[in-house]
């Protein structure tokens, strides 16, 4: 860890790239975790498509509401808090996430780039206007239920979850900003991500190509292929606070 501590202590332009492993440590089921009740009959990937929403909006909206309320029932973990603290230590820090929850924001991170959208930012399926009315915060039954989506105040269209579905492109502006940050950083921390979901998986490679060091933090070893690539094995909630403490003592 010593080499990584020195890299972090000397970093001037930091990118932190997070994936599902960070949220899983707060108790959020990953996308393909086994589901019970109503959802046991469906492949999650089959619910996460524009066609599924067009065919049965109440089913898809109900599933995403179940997921959103699951998120509201958990708290940011030490990894989220350490990531937020790093932005206070390194002024030029950019946080890019593949996660659709709001745990980074609740931990204190600002201006988070959500490459796959957010459960907490629904929009109209017709006119794309942001839906700003309050969503319910009551607990959904564990077995799930169908819920009719609200209507857009602007055009009357159905409101859809604000996530990126299979077959949809990632938000162009967010992806462009993430790629630019990776090309300009001197250190990139890749935390809790499998590194296989394209095009976001290009981000660590772009950082390496442009001269940065890359550190993978993951419970399982990550094969490194470059002298400037490092791997710290362990839960992010343990590794990141220790890394923060050692790089910025006091």
Curated annotation (Swiss-Prot):
Name this protein carries in UniProt: NAD-dependent protein deacylase 1
PROSITE patterns xref list: SIRTUIN
Pfam families: SIR2
Catalysed reaction, written as an equation: N(6)-acetyl-L-lysyl-[protein] + NAD(+) + H2O = 2''-O-acetyl-ADP-D-ribose + nicotinamide + L-lysyl-[protein]; N(6)-succinyl-L-lysyl-[protein] + NAD(+) + H2O = 2''-O-succinyl-ADP-D-ribose + nicotinamide + L-lysyl-[protein]
Subcellular localization, as worded in the UniProt entry: Cytoplasm
Alphabetical UniProt keywords: Cytoplasm, Metal-binding, NAD, Transferase, Zinc
Protein role: NAD-dependent lysine deacetylase and desuccinylase that specifically removes acetyl and succinyl groups on target proteins. Modulates the activities of several proteins which are inactive in their acylated form.
